[in-house]
Every structure is written in structure tokens, then in C-alpha cells.
Amino acid sequence: MITISETAQAHFVNLLSDQPEGTHIRVFVISPGTAQAECGVSYCPPDAVEADDTELEFNGFNAMVDEKSAPFLEEATIDFVTDQLGSQLTLKAPNAKMRKVSGDAPLVERIEYVIQSEINPQLASHGGNIMLVEITEDGIAVLQFGGGCNGCSMVDVTLKDGIEKQLLDMFPGELTGVKDVTEHQHGDHSYQ
């Protein structure tokens, strides 16, 4: 369910050494399955363990995951990285905003999952996002850009060289292309 790197495990053991005996960590998702999903890690004293928690054993500590968060933490990773600027704990949970869908799920669900878990997080760095409007009978994914992507001068490059290439590579034989139906209006909200 959750992979915690050796350096992150050592970091947690160090942090927990200053806590009361029996304290573990809790990994959770606030508003799981929504665009506002936020992941977090906190201390979990023994009296905060719930009967329906999943307990994951690591080297020197356990991690508790509540029942509601568990499916959204599939394939999550926690790492502790140190560089010239200092050290940082990172938690990546690709399924926090949307549960992973099976390979035999309908095409629209699989594309929506890729958009929410892979494409939109990349576009978010520019304040943008895309939404799947429909998939046409001839296999065209009809998309609408929003936020900073609406009116951006680079939207055609993003669409053809980025999004279309990624989706066609992931869904060969099912998708034939992508189409942008956004009425682009350049403004203060636009990235470039």
C-alpha cells in the first residue's frame, strides 16, 4: 500500500524517539477522491488507533491508515531527501484525488484517471488543468482547458506534443487523437 524509503524510515524512528512509548505515525488523506485531496502524516498515540485502521509494519515503527484513506493511498511513497537547501519529507500519493481504475474499466474512466493523476498535476504548476468532455465514436478525446491554460500561447504545443502523445501512447488502438474545444481567451489568468 505505502512504500517508505529507508531514509524516511530512519527519519520517523528519530522523530518517534522523542514521543511517548507506543506512538506510531498516521498517514491520511483529507477529502479523498476529490480535487481538493490533501495527504498528510502525523503522530498517532496508542489511544488514537481505531479498530478499522490498517497497521503497516516498518523498521522500528508502525504506520496507521484509516479505512477511508486506505484505497486512496495505494502506490503512495514517502521519502526523506537531503540536498544543498536542506532536508524534506515528501509524500506522493498518485491515487489521492481519484482511485486507481482497473485495466478493464471503461475507456472514459481510464482516461479520466490519467488526467487527474498524471496530467493535471503537471498543468497545475502553471495554474492550469484539463477536463475530459467526451470521447467521440471515432476515438477522439475531447478536452477543455481551464485555469492558466485557457488563453496560454503554448496551449497547442501542450495539447499535441504533451497530452495527445501521452494519451495515444497509453491507449493505443482505443484513442485516435485529442481535440481542444476551449474558447480560449487570453487574460491575466493565462500562463503566457
UniProtKB/Swiss-Prot annotation:
Keyword Iron annotated: yes
Cofactor comment: Binds 1 [4Fe-4S] cluster per subunit. The cluster is presumably bound at the interface of two monomers.
Single GO MF descriptor: 4 iron, 4 sulfur cluster binding
Cofactor names: [4Fe-4S] cluster
Sites where the protein binds [4Fe-4S] cluster: 149, 152
Pfam family, one: NifU
Assembly notes: Homodimer.
Function text: Involved in iron-sulfur cluster biogenesis. Binds a 4Fe-4S cluster, can transfer this cluster to apoproteins, and thereby intervenes in the maturation of Fe/S proteins. Could also act as a scaffold/chaperone for damaged Fe/S proteins.
Family per record: Belongs to the NfuA family.
Name recorded for this polypeptide: Fe/S biogenesis protein NfuA
